[in-house]
């Protein structure tokens, strides 16, 4: 009798990651009239609503999307255009379709890690640092190495010593209002970081 070999089940971290990706894709899917868990009524219920009349007093190009739905997963188009102009004023050329707005730092960090970090990569982080960050490279199977954080930023001697031993793919540090210390990079430490990065 012919018997097919069944593939072995995926590793637990892979299964969990696939489940999360599937859930994220479902959240971005916008073909449902009523989206359970969204907390917003169907668009047809909002026609003629007092809230819609209130929003129509603003100078918005698309009143129907303001406050009633998620809109583009890339972010609010007029804001992306405004950011393009602000970047251009700083001699940075960008197009609105090349700008992605995130729902906050955790969303941004997650996107960066998913696209840049491979299993086995080394990642430097502030120590102490922003603890919600630490699980993300761990899930990506990266090696996390802490860089001592002082009152004026990362300890440059510690960073230099660890750079001599490791080749990090990225160093996650926070320049202003560091979490949890509240410290801000001094100009000297900022310059030192630039020199070490070269």
Model regions and ranges:
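N-terminal basic, amphipathic alpha-helical segments
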Residues: 1-56, 195
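Conserved core of the PLP fold type I
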Residues: 60, 64-198
């Amino acid at each position: 009798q012919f018997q097919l070999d069944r593939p072995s089940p995926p590793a637990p971290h892979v299964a969990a990651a696939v489940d999360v990706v599937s859930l994220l894709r479902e959240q971005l899917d916008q073909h449902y009239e009523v989206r359970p868990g969204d907390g917003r009524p169907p668009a047809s219920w909002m026609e003629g609503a007092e809230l819609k009349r209130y929003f129509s007093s603003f100078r918005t190009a698309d009143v129907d999307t303001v406050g009633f739905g998620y809109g583009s997963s890339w972010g609010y188009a007029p804001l992306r255009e405004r950011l393009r102009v602000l970047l251009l004023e700083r001699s940075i050329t960008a197009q609105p379709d090349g700008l992605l707005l995130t729902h906050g730092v955790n969303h941004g960090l997650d996107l960066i890690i998913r696209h840049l970090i491979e299993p086995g990569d080394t990642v430097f982080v502030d120590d102490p640092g922003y603890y919600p960050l630490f699980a993300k490279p761990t899930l990506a199977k990266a090696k996390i190495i802490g860089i001592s954080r002082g009152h004026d930023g990362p300890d440059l001697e510690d960073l230099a010593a660890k750079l001599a031993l490791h080749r990090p793919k990225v160093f996650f540090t926070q320049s202003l209002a560091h979490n949890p210390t509240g410290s801000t990079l001094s100009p000297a430490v900022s310059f030192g970081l630039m020199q070490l990065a070269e």
